[in-house]
Protein backbone atom coordinates (compact mmCIF):
# COMPACT_ATOMS: atom_id res chain seq x y z
CA UNK A 1 0.00 0.00 0.00
CA UNK A 2 1.22 3.51 -0.84
CA UNK A 3 2.20 5.79 2.00
CA UNK A 4 0.54 9.17 2.39
CA UNK A 5 1.10 11.93 1.48
CA UNK A 6 2.02 11.84 -2.20
CA UNK A 7 4.95 14.18 -2.81
CA UNK A 8 6.59 15.76 -5.83
CA UNK A 9 10.30 16.22 -5.14
CA UNK A 10 11.53 18.88 -7.58
CA UNK A 11 15.23 19.33 -8.12
CA UNK A 12 17.08 20.73 -11.11
CA UNK A 13 19.68 18.61 -12.87
CA UNK A 14 22.57 20.19 -10.99
CA UNK A 15 21.17 18.71 -7.77
CA UNK A 16 20.46 15.25 -9.21
CA UNK A 17 23.04 13.74 -6.86
CA UNK A 18 20.32 13.61 -4.20
CA UNK A 19 18.50 10.97 -6.27
CA UNK A 20 20.78 8.14 -5.15
CA UNK A 21 20.31 9.02 -1.49
CA UNK A 22 16.53 8.98 -1.89
CA UNK A 23 16.58 5.68 -3.78
CA UNK A 24 18.76 4.03 -1.15
CA UNK A 25 16.49 5.19 1.66
CA UNK A 26 13.09 4.92 -0.02
CA UNK A 27 11.87 2.28 2.45
CA UNK A 28 12.44 4.72 5.29
CA UNK A 29 10.33 7.46 3.71
CA UNK A 30 6.98 8.13 5.37
CA UNK A 31 5.41 9.29 2.13
CA UNK A 32 5.19 8.32 -1.53
CA UNK A 33 7.75 10.43 -3.37
CA UNK A 34 8.26 11.08 -7.08
CA UNK A 35 11.39 12.90 -8.25
CA UNK A 36 10.85 15.45 -11.04
CA UNK A 37 13.18 17.87 -12.81
CA UNK A 38 13.04 21.08 -14.82
CA UNK A 39 11.77 19.12 -17.83
CA UNK A 40 8.79 17.79 -15.88
CA UNK A 41 7.23 21.08 -14.80
CA UNK A 42 3.92 20.34 -16.52
CA UNK A 43 3.39 17.68 -13.86
CA UNK A 44 2.93 20.46 -11.30
CA UNK A 45 -0.58 20.87 -12.69
CA UNK A 46 -1.42 17.62 -10.89
CA UNK A 47 -1.19 19.52 -7.59
CA UNK A 48 -4.58 21.05 -8.45
CA UNK A 49 -6.00 17.55 -7.93
CA UNK A 50 -5.73 17.31 -4.15
CA UNK A 51 -6.53 13.61 -4.21
CA UNK A 52 -3.44 12.73 -6.26
CA UNK A 53 -0.52 14.91 -5.17
CA UNK A 54 -0.49 16.71 -1.86
CA UNK A 55 2.93 18.29 -1.24
CA UNK A 56 5.72 19.89 -3.26
CA UNK A 57 9.30 19.78 -2.00
CA UNK A 58 12.12 21.65 -3.75
CA UNK A 59 15.79 20.95 -3.16
CA UNK A 60 18.93 23.03 -3.64
CA UNK A 61 20.86 26.05 -2.46
CA UNK A 62 17.84 28.40 -2.46
CA UNK A 63 14.10 28.26 -3.04
CA UNK A 64 14.38 31.48 -5.07
CA UNK A 65 15.69 29.63 -8.12
CA UNK A 66 12.45 27.62 -8.20
CA UNK A 67 10.01 30.52 -7.95
CA UNK A 68 10.11 31.33 -11.72
CA UNK A 69 9.44 27.67 -12.47
CA UNK A 70 6.66 27.12 -9.97
CA UNK A 71 4.53 30.23 -9.55
CA UNK A 72 3.45 30.63 -13.21
CA UNK A 73 2.05 27.10 -12.94
CA UNK A 74 0.53 27.18 -9.45
CA UNK A 75 -1.40 29.74 -7.38
CA UNK A 76 -0.63 31.63 -4.18
CA UNK A 77 -2.64 29.40 -1.82
CA UNK A 78 -0.38 26.48 -2.76
CA UNK A 79 2.59 28.11 -1.02
CA UNK A 80 1.34 26.34 2.10
CA UNK A 81 1.87 23.00 0.34
CA UNK A 82 5.44 23.75 -0.71
CA UNK A 83 8.57 23.68 1.40
CA UNK A 84 12.26 23.78 0.49
CA UNK A 85 15.22 21.79 1.75
CA UNK A 86 18.86 22.76 1.23
CA UNK A 87 20.06 19.40 2.53
CA UNK A 88 18.58 16.10 3.63
CA UNK A 89 20.89 14.61 6.22
CA UNK A 90 18.24 13.27 8.54
CA UNK A 91 15.28 11.38 7.12
CA UNK A 92 13.46 11.75 10.42
CA UNK A 93 13.42 15.53 10.00
CA UNK A 94 12.39 15.21 6.36
CA UNK A 95 9.52 12.85 7.21
CA UNK A 96 8.42 15.25 9.93
CA UNK A 97 8.43 18.18 7.47
CA UNK A 98 6.40 16.25 4.93
CA UNK A 99 3.74 14.96 7.30
CA UNK A 100 3.40 18.22 9.23
CA UNK A 101 2.89 20.08 5.95
CA UNK A 102 0.36 17.48 4.80
CA UNK A 103 -1.74 17.50 7.97
CA UNK A 104 -1.49 21.28 8.37
CA UNK A 105 -3.17 21.71 4.98
CA UNK A 106 -5.74 19.03 5.77
CA UNK A 107 -6.94 20.82 8.91
CA UNK A 108 -6.66 24.42 7.70
CA UNK A 109 -9.70 26.60 7.08
CA UNK A 110 -11.27 25.02 4.01
CA UNK A 111 -11.48 28.32 2.14
CA UNK A 112 -7.70 28.70 2.40
CA UNK A 113 -6.98 25.44 0.59
CA UNK A 114 -9.73 25.58 -2.03
CA UNK A 115 -10.05 27.67 -5.21
CA UNK A 116 -11.19 31.25 -5.00
CA UNK A 117 -13.65 30.66 -7.86
CA UNK A 118 -15.72 27.72 -9.00
CA UNK A 119 -17.01 28.00 -12.54
CA UNK A 120 -19.86 25.59 -13.19
CA UNK A 121 -21.06 24.47 -16.61
CA UNK A 122 -23.77 22.02 -17.55
CA UNK A 123 -23.53 20.64 -21.04
CA UNK A 124 -25.29 18.45 -23.57
CA UNK A 125 -23.32 17.23 -26.58
CA UNK A 126 -21.18 20.37 -26.64
CA UNK A 127 -18.12 18.84 -28.28
CA UNK A 128 -15.69 21.38 -29.81
CA UNK A 129 -17.70 24.41 -28.67
CA UNK A 130 -16.62 23.84 -25.09
CA UNK A 131 -13.04 24.71 -26.06
CA UNK A 132 -14.19 28.30 -26.61
CA UNK A 133 -15.30 28.52 -22.98
CA UNK A 134 -12.03 26.91 -21.89
CA UNK A 135 -9.93 29.46 -23.78
CA UNK A 136 -11.72 32.24 -21.91
CA UNK A 137 -10.90 30.56 -18.62
CA UNK A 138 -7.25 29.95 -19.48
CA UNK A 139 -6.85 33.67 -20.25
CA UNK A 140 -8.07 34.80 -16.84
CA UNK A 141 -5.80 37.14 -14.91
CA UNK A 142 -6.97 35.42 -11.74
CA UNK A 143 -5.80 31.83 -12.16
CA UNK A 144 -7.09 30.34 -8.91
CA UNK A 145 -10.21 28.68 -10.26
CA UNK A 146 -11.76 25.28 -10.79
CA UNK A 147 -14.16 24.36 -13.57
CA UNK A 148 -16.95 21.99 -12.63
CA UNK A 149 -18.44 20.43 -15.76
CA UNK A 150 -21.55 18.29 -15.33
CA UNK A 151 -22.40 16.37 -18.48
CA UNK A 152 -26.10 15.73 -19.09
CA UNK A 153 -25.62 14.08 -22.49
CA UNK A 154 -27.66 10.93 -23.21
CA UNK A 155 -24.70 8.58 -23.72
CA UNK A 156 -21.02 8.21 -22.81
CA UNK A 157 -19.60 9.32 -26.15
CA UNK A 158 -19.60 12.99 -25.23
CA UNK A 159 -18.22 12.29 -21.76
CA UNK A 160 -15.28 10.44 -23.30
CA UNK A 161 -14.66 13.53 -25.44
CA UNK A 162 -14.65 15.75 -22.35
CA UNK A 163 -12.14 13.48 -20.62
CA UNK A 164 -9.52 14.54 -23.13
CA UNK A 165 -10.00 18.14 -22.02
CA UNK A 166 -9.79 17.38 -18.32
CA UNK A 167 -6.57 15.40 -18.78
CA UNK A 168 -4.75 18.57 -19.81
CA UNK A 169 -5.79 20.73 -16.85
CA UNK A 170 -6.49 19.38 -13.37
CA UNK A 171 -8.42 22.53 -12.51
CA UNK A 172 -11.20 20.89 -14.52
CA UNK A 173 -13.42 18.60 -12.48
CA UNK A 174 -15.56 16.48 -14.77
CA UNK A 175 -18.74 14.67 -13.76
CA UNK A 176 -21.23 12.52 -15.64
CA UNK A 177 -24.83 12.04 -14.56
CA UNK A 178 -26.25 8.52 -14.37
CA UNK A 179 -28.73 9.47 -17.07
CA UNK A 180 -29.98 12.42 -19.08
CA UNK A 181 -32.21 14.75 -17.07
CA UNK A 182 -33.05 17.49 -19.57
CA UNK A 183 -34.20 19.67 -16.67
CA UNK A 184 -31.73 22.52 -16.54
CA UNK A 185 -32.72 23.64 -13.04
CA UNK A 186 -32.15 20.14 -11.71
CA UNK A 187 -28.75 19.79 -13.39
CA UNK A 188 -27.55 23.26 -12.31
CA UNK A 189 -28.58 22.47 -8.75
CA UNK A 190 -26.35 19.41 -8.85
CA UNK A 191 -23.47 21.31 -10.49
CA UNK A 192 -23.47 24.04 -7.82
CA UNK A 193 -23.44 21.36 -5.12
CA UNK A 194 -20.14 20.10 -6.54
CA UNK A 195 -18.44 23.50 -6.34
CA UNK A 196 -15.80 24.19 -3.68
CA UNK A 197 -14.83 27.80 -4.40
CA UNK A 198 -15.68 30.78 -2.23
CA UNK A 199 -17.38 32.35 -5.25
CA UNK A 200 -19.24 30.71 -8.13
CA UNK A 201 -19.83 31.70 -11.74
CA UNK A 202 -22.34 30.17 -14.14
CA UNK A 203 -20.73 29.73 -17.57
CA UNK A 204 -22.60 28.38 -20.59
CA UNK A 205 -20.73 25.69 -22.48
CA UNK A 206 -19.92 27.79 -25.57
CA UNK A 207 -19.51 31.33 -24.22
CA UNK A 208 -16.51 33.53 -23.40
CA UNK A 209 -15.68 35.48 -20.26
CA UNK A 210 -13.28 38.40 -20.63
CA UNK A 211 -9.79 38.04 -19.12
CA UNK A 212 -10.28 40.35 -16.14
CA UNK A 213 -13.73 39.12 -15.11
CA UNK A 214 -12.70 36.81 -12.25
CA UNK A 215 -10.09 39.26 -10.96
CA UNK A 216 -12.48 42.22 -10.95
CA UNK A 217 -15.29 40.20 -9.39
CA UNK A 218 -13.04 38.78 -6.68
CA UNK A 219 -11.96 42.30 -5.72
CA UNK A 220 -15.58 43.50 -5.55
CA UNK A 221 -16.61 40.59 -3.33
CA UNK A 222 -13.58 41.03 -1.08
CA UNK A 223 -14.19 44.78 -0.74
CA UNK A 224 -17.62 44.32 0.88
CA UNK A 225 -18.59 41.15 2.76
CA UNK A 226 -22.28 42.01 2.38
CA UNK A 227 -22.21 41.72 -1.41
CA UNK A 228 -23.66 38.36 -2.39
CA UNK A 229 -24.03 38.74 -6.16
CA UNK A 230 -22.11 40.50 -8.93
CA UNK A 231 -22.97 41.05 -12.60
CA UNK A 232 -21.59 42.95 -15.59
CA UNK A 233 -22.63 44.08 -19.05
CA UNK A 234 -22.73 41.49 -21.84
CA UNK A 235 -22.84 41.11 -25.61
CA UNK A 236 -24.60 38.60 -27.86
CA UNK A 237 -22.95 37.55 -31.10
CA UNK A 238 -23.45 34.89 -33.75
CA UNK A 239 -20.81 32.27 -34.45
CA UNK A 240 -19.26 34.56 -37.08
CA UNK A 241 -19.18 37.45 -34.56
CA UNK A 242 -22.06 39.39 -36.13
CA UNK A 243 -23.94 41.35 -33.51
CA UNK A 244 -27.25 40.18 -32.11
CA UNK A 245 -29.44 42.33 -29.89
CA UNK A 246 -32.95 42.26 -28.52
CA UNK A 247 -34.00 45.71 -29.69
CA UNK A 248 -34.36 49.15 -28.16
CA UNK A 249 -37.13 48.25 -25.71
CA UNK A 250 -35.26 45.50 -23.90
CA UNK A 251 -35.67 45.46 -20.15
CA UNK A 252 -38.98 47.32 -20.01
CA UNK A 253 -37.32 50.51 -21.14
CA UNK A 254 -34.44 50.28 -18.66
CA UNK A 255 -31.78 48.94 -21.02
CA UNK A 256 -29.79 50.32 -23.92
CA UNK A 257 -26.97 49.03 -26.09
CA UNK A 258 -23.68 50.85 -26.51
CA UNK A 259 -20.85 50.18 -28.92
CA UNK A 260 -17.59 48.82 -27.51
CA UNK A 261 -14.55 47.55 -29.40
CA UNK A 262 -13.27 44.13 -28.37
CA UNK A 263 -10.61 42.13 -30.23
CA UNK A 264 -10.92 44.41 -33.25
CA UNK A 265 -14.73 44.18 -33.49
CA UNK A 266 -17.36 46.71 -32.42
CA UNK A 267 -19.89 44.84 -30.30
CA UNK A 268 -23.40 45.80 -29.26
CA UNK A 269 -22.99 45.70 -25.49
CA UNK A 270 -26.07 45.56 -23.31
CA UNK A 271 -25.86 47.96 -20.39
CA UNK A 272 -27.63 45.95 -17.70
CA UNK A 273 -29.87 48.10 -15.50
CA UNK A 274 -29.65 48.67 -11.78
CA UNK A 275 -31.85 46.56 -9.55
CA UNK A 276 -35.34 47.63 -8.45
CA UNK A 277 -38.86 46.21 -8.44
CA UNK A 278 -39.31 46.92 -12.17
CA UNK A 279 -36.03 45.55 -13.49
CA UNK A 280 -36.50 42.46 -11.33
CA UNK A 281 -39.93 41.72 -12.76
CA UNK A 282 -38.89 39.95 -15.94
CA UNK A 283 -35.95 37.83 -17.02
CA UNK A 284 -35.03 40.23 -19.81
CA UNK A 285 -34.54 42.97 -17.19
CA UNK A 286 -32.57 40.90 -14.71
CA UNK A 287 -28.83 40.42 -15.12
CA UNK A 288 -28.10 38.11 -18.02
CA UNK A 289 -24.65 36.51 -18.03
CA UNK A 290 -22.34 36.64 -16.20
CA UNK A 291 -23.96 35.67 -12.90
CA UNK A 292 -21.62 35.40 -9.94
CA UNK A 293 -22.54 34.56 -6.37
CA UNK A 294 -20.82 34.25 -3.07
CA UNK A 295 -21.30 30.47 -2.87
CA UNK A 296 -22.47 30.61 0.72
CA UNK A 297 -25.23 33.03 -0.30
CA UNK A 298 -26.38 30.90 -3.25
CA UNK A 299 -26.70 27.85 -1.00
CA UNK A 300 -28.50 29.85 1.69
CA UNK A 301 -30.99 30.92 -0.98
CA UNK A 302 -31.65 27.25 -1.68
CA UNK A 303 -29.66 26.92 -4.92
CA UNK A 304 -31.42 26.50 -8.28
CA UNK A 305 -34.88 24.95 -8.15
CA UNK A 306 -34.75 21.32 -9.24
CA UNK A 307 -38.44 21.62 -10.17
CA UNK A 308 -37.84 24.04 -13.04
CA UNK A 309 -36.76 22.70 -16.45
CA UNK A 310 -36.95 26.31 -17.72
CA UNK A 311 -36.96 29.73 -16.01
CA UNK A 312 -34.67 28.33 -13.31
CA UNK A 313 -32.44 31.36 -13.73
CA UNK A 314 -35.37 33.76 -13.37
CA UNK A 315 -36.48 32.18 -10.11
CA UNK A 316 -33.05 32.08 -8.45
CA UNK A 317 -32.31 35.65 -9.58
CA UNK A 318 -35.58 36.84 -8.03
CA UNK A 319 -34.49 35.28 -4.75
CA UNK A 320 -31.04 36.80 -5.09
CA UNK A 321 -32.18 40.35 -5.81
CA UNK A 322 -34.55 40.31 -2.84
CA UNK A 323 -32.22 38.84 -0.26
CA UNK A 324 -28.65 40.03 -0.79
CA UNK A 325 -26.63 43.10 -1.69
CA UNK A 326 -25.89 43.29 -5.41
CA UNK A 327 -23.03 44.96 -7.29
CA UNK A 328 -22.58 45.74 -10.96
CA UNK A 329 -19.19 46.01 -12.62
CA UNK A 330 -20.01 48.52 -15.32
CA UNK A 331 -18.09 47.00 -18.22
CA UNK A 332 -18.27 44.19 -20.74
CA UNK A 333 -17.58 40.90 -18.98
CA UNK A 334 -19.28 38.16 -20.97
CA UNK A 335 -19.89 37.26 -24.61
CA UNK A 336 -22.83 34.96 -25.30
CA UNK A 337 -22.89 33.10 -28.60
CA UNK A 338 -26.04 32.48 -30.62
CA UNK A 339 -26.39 29.83 -33.29
CA UNK A 340 -26.66 31.30 -36.78
CA UNK A 341 -30.03 29.62 -37.23
CA UNK A 342 -31.36 30.97 -33.91
CA UNK A 343 -31.62 27.40 -32.70
CA UNK A 344 -30.01 27.75 -29.28
CA UNK A 345 -31.35 25.44 -26.59
CA UNK A 346 -32.79 28.47 -24.79
CA UNK A 347 -34.34 29.96 -27.93
CA UNK A 348 -36.18 26.72 -28.72
CA UNK A 349 -37.96 27.02 -25.39
CA UNK A 350 -38.65 30.75 -25.60
CA UNK A 351 -42.37 30.21 -26.02
CA UNK A 352 -42.62 28.34 -22.74
CA UNK A 353 -40.22 30.71 -21.02
CA UNK A 354 -42.31 33.72 -22.06
CA UNK A 355 -45.47 31.98 -20.90
CA UNK A 356 -44.32 30.61 -17.57
CA UNK A 357 -42.06 33.47 -16.45
CA UNK A 358 -44.23 36.60 -16.74
CA UNK A 359 -47.60 34.88 -16.37
CA UNK A 360 -46.92 32.60 -13.43
CA UNK A 361 -43.53 32.78 -11.74
CA UNK A 362 -43.31 36.57 -11.50
CA UNK A 363 -46.81 37.32 -10.15
CA UNK A 364 -46.82 34.38 -7.74
CA UNK A 365 -43.30 35.12 -6.48
CA UNK A 366 -44.08 38.84 -6.11
CA UNK A 367 -47.19 38.02 -4.11
CA UNK A 368 -45.68 35.27 -1.94
CA UNK A 369 -42.57 37.26 -1.00
CA UNK A 370 -44.06 40.79 -1.14
CA UNK A 371 -41.38 41.88 -3.58
CA UNK A 372 -42.64 45.43 -4.10
CA UNK A 373 -42.55 45.98 -0.34
CA UNK A 374 -39.03 44.55 -0.20
CA UNK A 375 -37.82 47.12 -2.71
CA UNK A 376 -39.64 49.93 -0.93
CA UNK A 377 -37.53 49.09 2.10
CA UNK A 378 -34.42 49.07 -0.08
CA UNK A 379 -35.27 52.51 -1.49
CA UNK A 380 -35.54 51.00 -4.97
CA UNK A 381 -39.26 51.12 -5.72
CA UNK A 382 -40.87 52.48 -8.88
CA UNK A 383 -44.53 52.73 -9.84
CA UNK A 384 -45.82 49.22 -10.49
CA UNK A 385 -47.46 50.34 -13.73
CA UNK A 386 -44.07 49.93 -15.38
CA UNK A 387 -44.13 46.19 -14.69
CA UNK A 388 -46.79 45.43 -17.28
CA UNK A 389 -48.41 48.52 -18.80
CA UNK A 390 -45.81 51.16 -19.59
CA UNK A 391 -42.60 50.12 -21.36
CA UNK A 392 -41.46 53.67 -22.17
CA UNK A 393 -37.69 53.98 -22.26
CA UNK A 394 -36.49 55.69 -19.10
CA UNK A 395 -34.70 58.48 -20.99
CA UNK A 396 -38.08 59.44 -22.49
CA UNK A 397 -39.87 59.65 -19.13
CA UNK A 398 -39.94 63.27 -18.00
CA UNK A 399 -40.73 62.28 -14.41
CA UNK A 400 -38.13 59.49 -14.18
CA UNK A 401 -36.22 59.14 -10.91
CA UNK A 402 -33.28 56.76 -10.71
CA UNK A 403 -34.08 54.38 -7.85
CA UNK A 404 -31.93 51.26 -7.57
CA UNK A 405 -30.36 49.27 -4.75
CA UNK A 406 -27.38 47.83 -6.62
CA UNK A 407 -23.96 49.43 -6.23
CA UNK A 408 -21.66 50.15 -9.17
CA UNK A 409 -17.96 49.40 -9.53
CA UNK A 410 -15.69 50.41 -12.40
CA UNK A 411 -12.19 49.11 -11.57
CA UNK A 412 -10.57 50.06 -14.87
CA UNK A 413 -11.19 53.79 -14.62
CA UNK A 414 -10.77 56.72 -12.27
CA UNK A 415 -13.02 59.07 -14.23
CA UNK A 416 -15.74 58.72 -16.86
CA UNK A 417 -16.46 61.50 -19.33
CA UNK A 418 -19.79 61.80 -21.10
CA UNK A 419 -19.45 63.57 -24.45
CA UNK A 420 -22.70 65.04 -25.78
CA UNK A 421 -22.76 65.21 -29.55
CA UNK A 422 -20.08 64.51 -32.09
CA UNK A 423 -18.82 68.10 -31.99
CA UNK A 424 -17.55 67.45 -28.46
CA UNK A 425 -14.71 65.48 -30.05
CA UNK A 426 -13.33 68.76 -31.38
CA UNK A 427 -12.56 69.99 -27.87
CA UNK A 428 -8.75 70.07 -27.57
CA UNK A 429 -8.95 68.79 -24.01
CA UNK A 430 -10.32 65.46 -25.22
CA UNK A 431 -7.13 64.39 -26.99
CA UNK A 432 -5.12 65.04 -23.82
CA UNK A 433 -7.60 63.24 -21.59
CA UNK A 434 -7.67 60.29 -23.98
CA UNK A 435 -3.95 59.68 -23.44
CA UNK A 436 -4.72 58.58 -19.90
CA UNK A 437 -5.95 54.98 -20.07
CA UNK A 438 -7.61 55.42 -16.67
CA UNK A 439 -10.13 57.81 -18.27
CA UNK A 440 -13.29 56.31 -19.75
CA UNK A 441 -15.43 57.98 -22.42
CA UNK A 442 -19.02 57.58 -23.57
CA UNK A 443 -20.01 59.51 -26.70
CA UNK A 444 -23.76 60.18 -26.98
CA UNK A 445 -25.68 61.63 -29.89
CA UNK A 446 -29.37 62.12 -30.61
CA UNK A 447 -28.68 62.98 -34.25
CA UNK A 448 -26.73 60.09 -35.73
CA UNK A 449 -26.70 56.34 -35.28
CA UNK A 450 -24.28 54.27 -33.23
CA UNK A 451 -22.77 52.85 -36.42
CA UNK A 452 -21.98 56.34 -37.69
CA UNK A 453 -20.47 57.26 -34.35
CA UNK A 454 -18.22 54.21 -34.63
CA UNK A 455 -16.96 55.39 -38.01
CA UNK A 456 -16.15 58.80 -36.56
CA UNK A 457 -14.30 57.33 -33.59
CA UNK A 458 -12.27 55.07 -35.87
CA UNK A 459 -11.38 57.99 -38.12
CA UNK A 460 -10.16 60.08 -35.19
CA UNK A 461 -8.26 57.25 -33.49
CA UNK A 462 -10.58 57.16 -30.48
CA UNK A 463 -11.57 53.50 -30.71
CA UNK A 464 -11.17 52.99 -26.95
CA UNK A 465 -14.25 55.16 -26.47
CA UNK A 466 -17.74 53.73 -26.21
CA UNK A 467 -20.72 55.28 -27.96
CA UNK A 468 -24.50 55.28 -28.21
CA UNK A 469 -26.54 57.02 -30.88
CA UNK A 470 -30.21 57.74 -31.50
CA UNK A 471 -30.55 58.73 -35.14
CA UNK A 472 -34.21 59.60 -34.58
CA UNK A 473 -33.75 61.19 -31.18
CA UNK A 474 -35.23 64.43 -29.94
CA UNK A 475 -33.78 67.28 -27.92
CA UNK A 476 -35.24 65.68 -24.79
CA UNK A 477 -33.54 62.31 -25.36
Positions of PLM-derived features:
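N-proximal low-complexity "stem/linker" segments adjacent to membrane-targeting elements
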Residues: 2-7, 83-136
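Short, acidic, metal-binding catalytic loop of nucleotide-sugar glycosyltransferases
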Residues: 25-29, 135-144
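A conserved acidic beta->alpha catalytic loop
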Residues: 151-161, 179-181, 204
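Glycine-rich, basic loop-to-helix element that forms the pyrophosphate-binding segment
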Residues: 178-195
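Short aromatic/hydrophobic "clamp" motif used to bind/position activated sugar donors
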Residues: 200
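Conserved donor NDP-sugar-binding/catalytic core segment of glycosyltransferases
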Residues: 214-260
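Acidic donor-binding loop at a coil-to-helix junction in glycosyltransferase catalytic cores
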Residues: 309-316
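Catalytic core of nucleotide-sugar-dependent glycosyltransferases
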Residues: 332-340, 345-383
